Amino acid sequence: MLKWKVLAIAGMAFGLAGLGWGYAQQQTFPGFYELRIYKAQPGKRDALAARFASRTAAIYARYGITNVGYFIPQQSDPELGIDASDTFIYIRAYPSKDERDKRLKLAQSDPEFREVVISQERDPNARLIIKAHNIDMTPSGSYTAIAVVP
């Protein structure tokens, strides 16, 4: 009888350990997202995308800003003000809005960011961006699927 009790307790312990491990392996997603839509100077969209790929995304990552994705629209939508030839879109993620504010402030004070982005955007002959739109977002309570497609 004692043998069965020991086995039952051991089984429950392993079951609980497995359950805990399963919860620990669940992928969690940040609680705050930011959709950024840039209208680039004519003919400068690809240069803007290259600046993000080569420098800006790495600066953000250094400060704990999650680069969710960078996108080039494949068609224009005049109703939304999107011209596929000059629009660049990206999504960043953070644990919260307060963390977004803190992390962006740190990133924007980084000497490399100031050199790469701020100085270029202040120079009328070198700037890449005409206008930037920002949409703050949180996951819907019922369903949010964020997946990376190979």
Task: Name these PLM-found stretches.
Residues 1-9:
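Bacterial N-terminal signal peptides that target proteins for export
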Residues 9-17:
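Bacterial N-terminal signal peptides
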Residues 25-28, 51-68, 83-85, 93-135:
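An amphipathic, aromatic/His-enriched active-site/gating alpha helix that lines ligand/cofactor pockets
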Residues 28-51, 55, 59, 91, ...:
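Surface-exposed interaction/gating patches
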Residues 67-75, 80:
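Intrinsic, low-complexity N-terminal interaction/targeting segments
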